[in-house]
Structures are given as C-alpha cells and as structure tokens.
C-alpha cells in the first residue's frame, strides 16, 4: 500500500484479523514512481496465497506493476487482487456488492456468448460498434483460481475480438485507467479493427 491508499488497506487488514488470516504489509513511501520491484516487497512473497495491490495509480508505474504481476504469477498458488487507483468511494459502491449474484449473472452472460460470431454494442452515450468474436474465448474476473489475478472492482466479461473485425465508434465518458475521470467524452472511431 501507500499513504494515499492506507485507509483502504487498513480496512482489508481489519477484515483479515477478524478471519484470523496472517498478513504482511509493505508500504511504498515517497520513492515514486517505482521502476523496479523493491527487494523487501519481493521477499514477502514466499508462502503467500493472496496478494492485494492497494496503491495509488501512478501512470509512470505501469511498467513496475506489470513486472510485479508477472513476479507474483510465477507462484501458481497465489491469487492476486489488483487495485491501483482504488478509492473509498469505489470500495463502498463498486466492491461492496453481492458477489454470488454477480457470479451467477456472469455465468448466464458467458453462456449467452458461446458460439457468438459477432457482437453489436450500443449505449445511450453513442457507442455503436460491431466486434467479430468467432472462436474467441470469453473470460471473466468474478472468481479466480490460484495463480491468477483480477482487478478490483471486478465484474467484467471479456474476450479479445478478432483484430480485423471491429467497426464503429466507442465513446469513453467516465474514467480511463490511470488518466482519471474525463472532462469531456472521448470518441474513438474504429474501421476494420
């Protein structure tokens, strides 16, 4: 964790104490942005089964985060919750959900995509895109197995569409990763992928 995400990490720590789960914390101090995995952080990995990345989203740290994810995934026993940029509002409104209900909805949606060849996605904000998905594998991040990771908040069902079969417009009107909340909608026009 870090000073910006301390309260969220503390909430997880309190929950783990209630569950009698042993924990180790690593706090990133002011040495930002991280470029490499700190040795003391890496030294905490042996014997762990859960790793939570509760940190401020610093765009310049994306290469570090990728290295860290790969390092954690080397141990096929660890489940990782990845939360760069998580806020208390996200914890209260997006993470505080009925996960069993979310999982059942994801299973239903996943089944509905089996054998799909093309998706047509529209929104009131103006997204109108066709995606070719024939023979693509759909995944979700609702439940993970040892050796896997997911972002929190979670709830995604996704696949990699065919690279040459995407046509239309996508409207981004909320937040984009580490960039934050957009002031104005961003339209991206896609032609043949």
Residue ranges: model-predicted function:
Residues 1-169, 174-178, 183, 191:
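Active-site bordering "gate/hinge" segments
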Residues 188:
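Hydrophobic/aromatic beta-strand elements that line small-molecule binding cavities or substrate pockets
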């Amino acid at each position: 964790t870090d000073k910006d995400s301390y309260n969220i990490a503390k909430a997880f720590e309190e929950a783990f104490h209630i569950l009698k789960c042993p924990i180790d914390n690593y706090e990133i101090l002011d040495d930002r942005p991280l470029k490499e995995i700190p040795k003391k952080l890496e030294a905490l990995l042996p014997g762990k089964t859960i790793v939570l990345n509760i940190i401020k989203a610093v765009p310049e740290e994306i290469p570090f985060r990728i290295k860290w994810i790969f390092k954690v995934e080397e141990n096929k026993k660890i489940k990782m919750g990845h939360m760069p940029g998580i806020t208390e509002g996200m914890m209260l409104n997006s993470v505080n959900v009925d996960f069993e209900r979310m999982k059942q909805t994801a299973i239903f949606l996943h089944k509905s995509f089996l054998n799909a060849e093309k998706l047509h996605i529209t929104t009131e904000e103006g997204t109108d895109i066709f995606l070719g998905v024939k023979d693509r594998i759909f995944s979700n991040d609702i439940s993970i197995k040892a050796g896997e990771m997911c972002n929190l908040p979670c709830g995604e069902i996704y696949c990699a569409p065919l690279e040459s079969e995407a046509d239309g417009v996508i409207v981004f009107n909320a937040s984009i990763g580490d960039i934050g909340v957009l002031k104005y909608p961003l339209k991206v026009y896609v032609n043949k992928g």
